[in-house]
From Swiss-Prot:
It comes from Aspergillus niger (strain ATCC MYA-4892 / CBS 513.88 / FGSC A1513). It comes from the Eukaryota. One of its GO terms (cellular component) is mediator complex. It is found in: Nucleus. GO terms for biological process: regulation of transcription by RNA polymerase II. One of its GO terms (molecular function) is RNA polymerase II cis-regulatory region sequence-specific DNA binding. This is Mediator of RNA polymerase II transcription subunit 8. Residues 187-217 are annotated as: Disordered. Pfam families: Med8. Its main location: nucleus. The keyword Nucleus applies. InterPro entries: Mediatior_Med8_fun/met.
Amino acid sequence: MSSLNQDQIKTLEQSRQRLIQLTHSLASLITSLNQSDPLPSWTSLQSQATIISNNLLTISDHLSDNRDLLSNIVAYPDASYPSRVPANNVALEQVLRTKLDPRVEDWVARGRRAGAPTTSSDAGAGALGQYQTSSGQRLLSDDAIAELWDWAPVAANEEARKRNWGGNYTLEEREMGIENVVTGLSRVLEDDDEEDESDSEEGEGEADEMEVVGARRRSGAGAGLEFDIAAANTGSGANAGAGAKVVAPVVPLDEILRFMTTGAVPGQR
């Protein structure tokens, strides 16, 4: 192979930098696991795992994009390389190594076996879009997977529309009658529609029963007026007033409007 040009040298340098980043990320994770007492939190481990995963993806994409160059390049020591130094011999042996480390070779073999079904051609796929791997596992072909993904969103949406999400009963149970539903619970479930209606009625009633019953000037340096608000007495007769808290007379609406426009305190004109 002829000498490398600047672009090829840049590609090799990028490979080196990415591998260094991955090595530092792995070393940081190993150090935190070995030296931390107690062990790092799950969030810290997840963050480190995410960094390592991103580094692996970056290296994988880089190696795939430059596969032709990296597979054809040949490494050899220059005459000026100090190979007589023992420390340099270790690095030289790693660079000139033609076979992978046994452990790495096992990892690569397992990865290729795991990725083989997804890269297999659809030739020989059965009528149902399935084919059988060398290990006997039956998998869907690429066309069958694409067809499945086209069908799944529509089918899931149609099924979701049939459900009463967040309720105590499904639409099928309501059609059959909720009195016939066996929930297995010791408590009695209430109908959601009736509960929603009662909540809305209570909310409207509470909003109508609030009245301004008094006003006084705010104490301290802050200027302004404070209004006393209490529940209105909606009952009639002696029974309605029994047990009710006696409150100050209601401030007329025109008094409140006059205070808002002129600043005159209610009752002091």
